[in-house]
Amino acid sequence: MTTLFISDLHLDPARPAITELFLDFLRTQVPGSDALYILGDLFEAWIGDDTPSTAADAVAEALHAVATTGVPVFFMPGNRDFLVGAAYAQRAGFRILPDPTVIDLYGQPTLLMHGDLLCTDDTAYQAFRAQTRDPAFQAQFLSQPLAARVAFAQQARAASHARQSELKQGDQAQFETVTDVAPAEVDATFVRYGLDRIIHGHTHRPAIHIVQAGGRTCTRVVLGDWYEQGSVLRVDADGLALEQLAL
């Protein structure tokens, strides 16, 4: 049996081929597995469960179909879809996990994260994250009319793209540092939780890293994004493997 991990699909009506790839993945590769974990950024943006979206409806229907076959589906919010709430979770048949979460994965304690908490060198983003994860902020935002939420999301996305462009045009080494995990934070996280494996997404740099932390040999698995292809981590009792899914 196998447990599947994915993240950073960034599903968007502007990229229907990726949505179709995901729906095909749910139909053909998830049934019969032990569980499916979605570690954030399933959607490019999410401004409330009440937002009309035929694509989100199709995704919810497909996820619910998987869950009804007996495969547990878990969702951890990312930096793009942290406002996914209980109403959508019920429709999709998944359980929302806090970030981070420790699970027992075939006898090995494993820390699951979206991954943005490890990017502590990006101090501006960490401040934004702290603000937007505040329950009072979220309640106030979700109480606004849909049009106001759409406008805010568009402004936030434009600001994010502008900042990314500014960073890319600057020092390349600085860009790589700011947009990737901070090694010191990775080490501290391994020590804090006292375990030897972390699985996360967010950085779009799929890889399996072997690091030393707290005097132990540890594994950090980074999930891939779904822009030019799909990406899935398969874990069973014998090991793990990152795989690409062709469009």
From Swiss-Prot:
Keywords of this entry: Cell inner membrane, Cell membrane, Hydrolase, Lipid A biosynthesis, Lipid biosynthesis, Lipid metabolism, Manganese, Membrane, Metal-binding
Molecular function as annotated in GO: manganese ion binding; UDP-2,3-diacylglucosamine hydrolase activity
Keyword Lipid biosynthesis: yes
Membrane disposition: Peripheral membrane protein
The protein's annotated pathway: Glycolipid biosynthesis; lipid IV(A) biosynthesis; lipid IV(A) from (3R)-3-hydroxytetradecanoyl-[acyl-carrier-protein] and UDP-N-acetyl-alpha-D-glucosamine: step 4/6
EC number(s) stated in the UniProt entry for this protein: 3.6.1.54
Localization per Swiss-Prot or TrEMBL: Cell inner membrane
Domain of life assignment: Bacteria
Main location: membrane
Positions that bind substrate: N79, R80, D122, S160, D171, Q174, H202
Disulfide partners: none
Catalysed reaction equations from the record: UDP-2-N,3-O-bis[(3R)-3-hydroxytetradecanoyl]-alpha-D-glucosamine + H2O = 2-N,3-O-bis[(3R)-3-hydroxytetradecanoyl]-alpha-D-glucosaminyl 1-phosphate + UMP + 2 H(+)
GO CC term, one of those recorded: cytoplasm
Bound cofactor: record note: Binds 2 Mn(2+) ions per subunit in a binuclear metal center.
Binding site for Mn(2+) 2: D41, N79, H114, H202
GO process terms (BP): lipid A biosynthetic process
Cofactor(s) of this protein: Mn(2+)
Annotated CDD domains: MPP_YbbF-LpxH
Binding residues annotated for Mn(2+) 1, in chain numbering: D8, H10, D41, H204
The keyword Hydrolase appears for this protein: yes
Similarity-based family: Belongs to the LpxH family.
Entry function: Hydrolyzes the pyrophosphate bond of UDP-2,3-diacylglucosamine to yield 2,3-diacylglucosamine 1-phosphate (lipid X) and UMP by catalyzing the attack of water at the alpha-P atom. Involved in the biosynthesis of lipid A, a phosphorylated glycolipid that anchors the lipopolysaccharide to the outer membrane of the cell.
Name of the protein this chain belongs to: UDP-2,3-diacylglucosamine hydrolase
Organism of origin: Xanthomonas campestris pv. campestris (strain B100)
Lineage, highest ranks first: Bacteria, Pseudomonadati, Pseudomonadota, Gammaproteobacteria, Lysobacterales
Primary gene name: lpxH
